[in-house]
Amino acid sequence: MTHDLNDTLIFVKVVEQGSFIAAANSLGLPKTTVSRKVQELETRLGARLLHRTTRRIGLTEAGAVYHEHCQRIARELEEAESAVGQLQSGPRGWLRFTVPYSLGITWIAPLLGEFHAQYPEIQLDMHLGNEKLDLIGGEADLALRVGALPDSNLVARKLGSLRTQVFASPSYIERYGEPLHPDELQFHRTLALRKNRNVHNNRFFWSLSDGSDVREFPVNPLMVANDPAALNGAVLCGEGLLLTGDVMAKPFVQSGMVRRVLAGWTGPEVDFNAVFAGGRLVSPKVRAFVDFLVTRLNFDADYMMAQCPARLAAQRANGDAEVEVEVEAELRAEGKRILEKATA
């Protein structure tokens, strides 16, 4: 069967534009030519692809199947032409990517200005959220995702690993005490993510490991959200304990607003990946952005261990007691100021 690729591309454009007239205007062709090309395509395939009415067009079942495959072909042709052009002029064009809100705000957004300074011809469209856009269907060029990849058609490049730990503000510890073992968590005020819920019994658990074994400990959250960033205000105000990524908590630890609790226990470690559709040409703009992130992201988990209460206790034993007591007094005062400001 002979095949005219132009007929296929015209069909994709008609579906994209929603009418023959709009497609003709977009392509710079007469409407009669566009209509004839689609008819010739239907004749060659032996199937009607479009429902035609005076006001609109719609896809038949055969048309929907054909369009799904042809849309990918059209997009890959466009990307191939763009890639060849960028070999001459450098990466350029819109780069659409998605990233979870907490990581996007804390780690990705502060780097975008630097990236644009290096690649001024790349325009960035960042989608913050936990919903997964369709990379295969072209809703985004790239996704920055945490955790395992559910779709075998996606490939990933690892940007780093995220370790989760339990954090509390000085004001919380002053008011409610500090848990010394995860068994005590069920008696403490906690802030949890929806993913911590057990779907079978509708109870919440935190998975924690002491290095030799992983156990699930029940918690009774007073607040639940789908992103840890939504719980930051509550943990800073001393309302509860939060199990979150060390890199998300790092700015607050550095400023003394929170500290790690339950020394020796850590939550799950998950990968942070740059994800894109497999089997597709990786455009120079995507490659440039991923290479930049690999170079600039620094998930320094060792820093968090330096803030571990057990390590601070060891420092006191080695003669740093007066300095540490003074620091903790300042942290308690800061915690009170945060709480008073939030409840004023």
Curated annotation (Swiss-Prot):
A Pfam cross-reference name: LysR_substrate
Disruption phenotype: Disruption of the gene alters the expression of about forty genes associated with diverse functions, including extracellular enzyme production, attachment, biofilm formation and flagellar biosynthesis. The mutant shows reduced virulence, but the effect is less pronounced than that of XC_3703 mutation.
Domain of life: Bacteria
Keywords associated with the record: DNA-binding, Transcription, Transcription regulation, Virulence
Family annotation (Gene3D superfamilies): 3.40.190.290, Winged helix-like DNA-binding domain superfamily/Winged helix DNA-binding domain (1.10.10.10)
Subunit structure: Interacts with the cyclic di-GMP effector XC_3703.
Free-text activity regulation comment from the record: Activity is regulated by cyclic di-GMP. Cyclic di-GMP specifically binds to XC_3703, which inhibits the interaction of the XC_2801-XC_3703 complex with DNA and prevents the transcription of the target genes.
Gene Ontology molecular function, alphabetical: DNA-binding transcription factor activity; sequence-specific DNA binding
Function text: Transcriptional regulator that directly or indirectly regulates the expression of virulence-related genes, including flhB, aaeA, fliL and flgG. Binds to the promoter of the target genes only in the presence of XC_3703.
GO biological process terms, semicolon-separated: DNA-templated transcription
Residue ranges of DNA binding: 20-39
Identification of the protein by name: HTH-type transcriptional regulator XC_2801
Residues of the HTH lysR-type domain: 3-60
Family: Belongs to the LysR transcriptional regulatory family.
